[in-house]
A protein has these predicted regions:
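Amphipathic, charge-rich alpha-helical segments that serve as recognition/docking helices
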Residues: 2-104
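Extended aliphatic helical segments
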Residues: 8, 54, 93, 110-113, ...
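Extended amphipathic alpha-helical segments with heptad-repeat/coiled-coil character used for oligomerization
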Residues: 89-124, 136
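C-terminal helical accessory/scaffold domains
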Residues: 118-182
Length: 182
């Protein structure tokens, strides 16, 4: 005799192997199998789908299903698998849902994903750079002086673009007095 869990698993497997399932239905089925205790590898083995397809579908299952359905039904939007795979580049599922929600087109998804990736890299690099400068004795400039940077009252000794990787070594010229970053 098989357990209730095994019965549900068999029914899910039979349904997933139907050819008329949508990507969203496959995603939900894979998620249910995962919830029942199967691993991604086991799901791939049982269904005959590749591991990468299973992983992609499970990422689709993490999205806001109502918003996803709304975008799929919008004839002007034309949501593609490529768009959904593009969203996977964002680790934070809430941010994926926000991008999906705000996007006005397929191209807009790609643009928003790229912007988010760039912004995340800048934040990460800023954090690394601040830590490195602090260890070097460079302090954050007081807020009241922040605008002076733009009117020539400060001597800029180095500029670092946060879209680039933070250099391993930062060489600062010898200066009299405290150095600040902004």
């Amino acid at each position: 005799k098989i357990s209730r869990k095994e019965q549900v698993g068999i029914m899910l497997l039979e349904n997933i192997q139907r050819e008329d399932l949508t990507i969203q239905e496959q995603a939900q089925g894979f998620q249910m199998m995962l919830d029942l205790g199967d691993t991604e590898d086991q799901i791939a083995e049982k269904t005959g789908f590749s591991k990468s397809t299973v992983r992609h579908r499970l990422n689709i299952a993490k999205l806001d299903q109502e918003k996803l359905k709304e975008k799929q039904q919008d004839d002007a939007f034309q949501l593609t698998l490529k768009d959904l795979y593009e969203l996977e580049k964002i680790k934070d599922v809430e941010m994926r849902n926000e991008i999906l929600d705000k996007a006005s087109s397929s191209r807009d998804i790609v643009s928003r994903v790229q912007n988010e990736i760039t912004n995340a890299k800048k934040k990460e690099n800023a954090k690394k750079l601040k830590t490195k400068l602090k260890k070097m004795g460079v302090e954050k400039a007081p807020e009241q002086y922040s605008q002076q940077m733009y009117n020539g009252k400060w001597n800029t000794v180095i500029e670092i673009n946060l879209t680039d990787d933070v250099p391993d070594e930062i060489e600062l010229p010898e200066q009299k007095g405290q150095m600040y970053w902004y």
